[in-house]
């Protein structure tokens, strides 16, 4: 989904991406456990809240990034993210720099806080890379929004 908008007299290209981050070794970090395991359940819920808080916080600091919809599952984060590109006429191959920067900041902030909470400094929280897919049209956007809203394993969503 691409649209051109004007901000301060310059053209911007806005592109929507579906992004998926997976936990390291597909660990179920954010899974809510059996109610009898109160301490474990609280830890998982707290880790999920860290990711939710940092997702919102990091998006505030990246002016080119807007969160459309997101879902945190036990071992992954799925999000629809719009990216405004300052130079739409510049042909750039690969992942958009502002999206990559946003993901790197999110991973670093969440990993630091999660590792402090687990008392495991330096441990891997997320897989090295992430998956992204450009949303090409309204049908694809509707399908992805439905997929996110109907996910069976949602721990927390926004």
Feature-to-residue mapping (PLM):
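Short catalytic/metal-binding and nucleic-acid-binding patches
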Residues: 1-158
């Amino acid at each position: 989904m691409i649209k051109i908008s004007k901000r301060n007299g310059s053209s911007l290209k806005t592109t929507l991406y579906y992004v998926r981050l997976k936990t390291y070794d597909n660990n179920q970090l954010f899974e809510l456990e059996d109610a009898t395991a109160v301490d474990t359940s609280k830890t998982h819920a707290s880790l999920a809240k860290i990711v939710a808080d940092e997702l919102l916080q990091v998006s505030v600091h990246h002016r080119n990034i807007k969160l459309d919809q997101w879902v945190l599952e036990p071992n992954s984060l799925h999000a629809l993210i719009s990216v405004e590109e300052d130079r739409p006429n510049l042909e750039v191959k690969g992942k958009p720099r502002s999206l990559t920067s946003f993901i790197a900041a999110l991973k670093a902030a969440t990993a630091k806080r999660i590792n402090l909470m687990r008392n495991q400094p330096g441990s891997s929280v997320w897989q090295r890379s992430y998956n992204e897919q450009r949303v090409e049209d309204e049908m694809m956007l509707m399908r992805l929004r439905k997929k996110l809203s109907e996910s069976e394993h949602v721990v927390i969503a926004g």
